[in-house]
Amino acid sequence: MIKKSALITLFLVSLILGVSLSQKPFYCQAPEPTPSLNTDGLTLKMVQILTRHGDRTPLYSTLKPTMNTWDCNLGWLMVSSLNNVPGAATDVDRLFRKVYMPNREYFPGNCSDGQLTSLGFQQHLQLGQSLRQLYVDKYELLPSELSVDAASTIWVRSTDVPRTIQSVQGHLTALFPPTTVTSGSGIPIININTMDNYYENMTPNPTLCPELAVLIANTTTTPEWGEFITNTTQLKEDVMETLGISVFPGWSSLMDLFFATQCHDFPLPEGVTQDMVTQVYEAAYWQYQYQLSFPMIARLGMSTFLEEVVDNIRAFVNGTSSVKYIVFSGHDDSVGPFTNLFGLMKEWPPYASHVELELWSDEKDNYFLQFKFNGQSYTLNGCEDVMCPIDSFFETAYSILVPNYADACSNSTMTF
């Protein structure tokens, strides 16, 4: 049996592993959540949260021996279970740790590519703590202690990727620290729901929607794209020569390498200047937002996910669901395209970015939705205030959803 004292020790160790943030690129850390606006006379009933994972190692490596050595102290304790019945764990008597072997990884050191770092886990501990202050202490949406009953009102989904699963574990650990777990009832289990990548809709998925791949490819034939290629050719040649690489990995991969390096106060690769980093980011972001600027690409990419979010709200309002705290743990390709649907994406989503869709009601059971993104509340199109009447939000959302989605995804004659 794992005692509460052991859980508390694990929690404190993970806090110690955190790395303090100095002056770094915006990409390194999203702003913290803030209190909601215009809440007088209203009660918070439900919230859905979409997050990007925390700080991670790069996804791209130059494979040069001069690359920085990455040290990943964040472990992963786990136990297999033959019993999937919801409830509490009362018979856990040992844990297993997954360990990356030194110098057998993509980078020098003991880190896999794209692995959540100790800093990344700390960022989601911090996010969970901030959300606890809002949704437990301030708005009393959730109880102060995690019991089996409380766990039944929480629903969690993650992409089936270690860094997103570990990020949401950090989020939930700080939302209900081990000291707030109801004693004598075992360890409450919170399912982290995942799905096969083929069906994943938390990010734009051309496998799920083949037409999306066609439309994205078509963006590379436009005059604007041709001008972009011309304007960035010299930068591309300079960066490749500086890094000593012969195959161009793409702007976003280079941006990721440079920003991940700076987020850990590592030196940039020899010859790479801050001006070069800035230009690489500008090229990566232009390409990212340009393709999402085509309405049908934006809508096809996130339509079914938005539909799930809307359905969750309807189920709660209609009384067919009692789940009131829903977390989606995803990527930049989750947060960016989702906020883009509402015209709110203005930069690349930083690590630990977060979107909150809060459902409020007045004493007459009139419902309102407040849309919050990285610490700011927004007035959505079709709404007159940050507190948007729920029917107005539904109208806006349904104008974004793609009708006959399956047909649209197989329509090779569709235009932007």
UniProtKB/Swiss-Prot annotation:
PANTHER family: ACID PHOSPHATASE-RELATED, COUNTING FACTOR 60. GO terms for cellular component: extracellular region. It comes from Dictyostelium discoideum. GO terms for molecular function: phosphatase activity. InterPro entries: Acid_Pase_AS, His_Pase_clade-2, His_PPase_superfam, Histidine_acid_phosphatase. Residues 1-22 form the signal peptide. It is found in: Secreted. Glycans are attached at residues 110, 218, 231, 318, 411. Disruption phenotype: Cells die quickly. It holds the Pfam family His_Phos_2. Cell-counting factor that limits the maximum size of the multicellular structure. Does not possess acid phosphatase activity. Cells with decreased levels of this protein form large groups while cells overexpressing this protein form small groups. Belongs to the histidine acid phosphatase family. GO terms for biological process: negative regulation of aggregate size involved in sorocarp development. Component of the counting factor (CF) complex, which includes cf60, cf50, cf45-1 and ctnA. Its main location: secreted. Keywords: Glycoprotein, Secreted, Signal. This is Counting factor 60. The keyword Secreted applies.
